[in-house]
Structure formats: C-alpha cells, structure tokens
Amino acid sequence: MSLSSRATLVVLCCLFMLIPSFTTAATEQGLHARSRCESYSFNNGKSFRSCTDLLVLNSYLHFNYAQETGVLEIAYHHSNLESSSWISWAINPTSKGMVGAQALVAYRNSTSGVMRAYTSSINSYSPMLQESPLSLRVTQVSAEYSNGEMMIFATLVLPPNTTVVNHLWQDGPLKEGDRLGMHAMSGDNLKSMASLDLLSGQVTTTKSVNRNMLLVKQIHAIVNALSWGILMPIGVMAARYMKNYEVLDPTWFYIHVVCQTTGYFSGLIGGLGTAIYMARHTGMRTTLHTVIGLLLFALGFLQILSLKARPNKDHKYRKYWNWYHHTMGYIVIVLSIYNIYKGLSILQPGSIWKIAYTTIICCIAAFAVVMEILQFKKRWARLFFKKSKDVEADQPTVSVDVIGETEKAERKKASGGIEIQIENYNITKNFMIPSVFVISYPHTSPPLLAFHSYHHPSTSIAATAA
C-alpha cells in the first residue's frame, strides 16, 4: 500500500470516529432547544400539550387546541424582561401585518406591582394599545410576573377547523403613569411575526417581508443623510465662503445650485418615496420625525419658488430677499441634521452609522469654523485698512529737503514767496498765501537752505531758511 493510500485511510477513519460525536452533539442541542419550551412548568399548575420556541424576543408559546370547536388555550411566555415593560401577543385573522391584529396586552403596575391583562383591537399603524373588545371571543385573560418572566394566559375561540394562524408578539417600555411606550423599530422587534400551524406547532416566518422593509428603511436613511444632511450644508458653505474670492466667481453659484437642487430632489424621490412606501406597508406614524420631514420638503419648495421672485442686485428690495433666503436656508440645515439623528434613533441601525455621520458633520463644522475665522479677520482687516486710509488722507503730510543757495533763489523767484528773518529758530510771524510761504533765518557758511514744505488738502505752504 502506497503512502498516499495510507494517509487517505487514516483520514477516513478519523471522520468515521467523529461522526458519532457530531450526531450526539446535534441531538443534545436539539433536546436542549426543545427542553427550553417543554421542560417549563407554570406556577399556577397549568399544562399544555404543545409549545413552540418563538424566533425572537426570548419568547415561547404554549397552547392547547381543539380543531373541532376552535378553542385555543394559550400561554405566552416572555423571559429576560424588566419589570417596567409591557408584552403583547396577538392573532391576525385577516392578514400578516399589524392592522387587524387581535391582541392580548399585559404589564405590571409600577405602584402596586399587580399585573394587569386586557384585550386590544389594533385598527391602525399607530395604536395606543388601549383596552377594547376583540373580534374573536376571548375569556380567562390573566397575567403573571416572576423573576424577569412575564406571561399572558387566555382562551380564544377561533372559527372551526382553523389550522394556521398569523400571530405577532411584541414588547416595549413602560413610561410614567403606566403608559405603554413605543416598541423598538429595529432588530428583533421587526421580526416578531410568523405563521403558526396549530396542529404541528411549526412556525413559518415572513423573512422576505421583514428584510425588504429593513432594506427600504436603510435606503431611506442613507438617501436623506446624503441629501439633506451632507449636500445641503456643502451647498450653503459654497455660497457663503467661495463667493468672497473673485477667482471662484461664478463657480460658487453653480456649486451652490447643484448641491441644493440635487439634495432636494434626491431627498424628494428617495426620501419621500421610501417614506410613502413604509407608510403603505407599516403605517404612517405621526411622530416628530415625520412632521419635521414634511416641514423640510415644504421649506425646500418655498426656497425654489423664491428664486422666481429674486430682485436684481441693485434693487432696493434685494437685501430683504437675501435675508429671507439665508434665514430659510439656515433653518433647513439645522432641522435636517436634527431630523437625521432623530431618524437614526428610530431605526437604531448600530452605533457605526451614527459615528460615521457625526464624523462627517464634525468635519464640515470644523471647516466652517475655520472659514468664519478667516472671513472675520479679512473683514476686520479690510475695515481697519479703510479707516487708516481715511485718517491718513485727513492728516497733513510733512517733508524736509536740504537745498543750496542757488535753488533757493530759483524757488523764491518762481513762487513769489516772502522772506523774513527768524532769530533763535522761533517763527515770529506766519503768512498764509495760495502757493508758498518762505521763511529765512541766519545760517553759518557755506549757506544752505532748509526747505520745509507743509501740505494740506486745502492749501500748500512752504518754509525756507537761509
């Protein structure tokens, strides 16, 4: 037998030895998974013939079902739960969604600690889960809470010979005053629905619907973050900072228009389009995020309309139009950034999304701060330079020349100046004449002339000394 054949035989032997181990592990895992549901015993002594481990939210469903009569006795069991939480289990006899679901709701009173269980019929996508009768007959509704486990018990009567039902289960926080808070809008809370075979206990999920909706929500977040949260601020910065440089005129204007129009219409098509899709499939909830989103589209549309009413640069109303246009633009930017963070808190896609957007916004804000400082220095430098020029123009200028006797005579002759004598460098009399004022004083040999010219915006004076 060759060496390769021996090696192959050894490998096969090892595999055959490992197969029983894999089988045993799988069997133990299956028994363990099955025991999570079947081995549970209720404190009230109730027992159920069937049970199933629900896929998400640490939940289990125990039930007894009589097909001939349609009587369904259930116990919905939710583990690893805070006492300040509410739970719900529902059957939807008409569809797979939330609208039309007939729900059982339970929570623990924050003051007395007593459990409350009641029924609630869900007729919209923004339910308050208030107590209301169901379309199904239901009796013996009760609830229990112990050691982080909350349970709902009830008996429902389904149409006879019903074998498969669409059921939903959910949890959420309990607010002040025992108000039921909104459940999470991401992760497992969006996957808590399935079809239940009452005869076999098999659960069939609707993963495609959940995945499609999650994809739509991600597209909605990305499109709006890029359009309203990034392109819009860049367009505003182009108009504010680039137009101060003549070399960038009119490039800044085209960048501003492209960023604003692209941001608005991409947000209109991608953002509003996905929002309408989600409203049709999961319901339009009147939240602050929704209100701000609609307000942003309205303000953006007004900005577009205002371009038709823009006066010429030399028009007396142009400054008022600029105030309006700039103010509306800044309001849109602030609301956009706030609403993006609001949407991220609803979607809860993971911290990396918020970190990435925050990093981009911080970079844009840092660049804006630097440009504001540069513009401030440039503006004040220009203003200071202008004031210095004005002061310099108002002040007289003085110049002194040393000339010889010959040039002195020529200047005196040309100007018609008056020569007077000065003793001890003290001027005894001043003469203001239209052209030149000449003063002479004794000086040592060789004779020099100190020509002192005094210029003022309104007159010209010269003083000479010999």
From Swiss-Prot:
Gene3D superfamilies (alphabetical): 1.20.120.1770
Membrane topology, record value: Multi-pass membrane protein
Main subcellular location of this protein, as a coarse class: membrane
Binding residue positions for heme b 2: 256, 325
Co-factor binding details: Binds 2 heme b groups non-covalently.
GO molecular function: metal ion binding
Keyword Acetylation attached: no
InterPro entries: AIR12_DOMON, Cyt_b561/ferric_Rdtase_TM, DOMON_domain
Residues reported in the UniProt entry to bind heme b 1: 220, 289
UniProt key word Ribonucleoprotein: no
Key words of the record: Electron transport, Heme, Iron, Membrane, Metal-binding, Signal, Transmembrane, Transmembrane helix, Transport
Domain DOMON: 57-172
Cofactor list: heme b
Signal sequence annotation: 1-25
Pfam family, one: Cytochrom_B561
Localization per Swiss-Prot or TrEMBL: Membrane
Entry function: May act as a catecholamine-responsive trans-membrane electron transporter.
Entry text on domains: DOMON domain could bind catecholamines and thereby could regulate the cytochrome b561 domain function. DOMON domain could bind one heme b.
Protein name (record): Cytochrome b561 and DOMON domain-containing protein At3g59070
Protein source organism: Arabidopsis thaliana
Taxonomic lineage of the native organism: Eukaryota, Viridiplantae, Streptophyta, Embryophyta, Tracheophyta
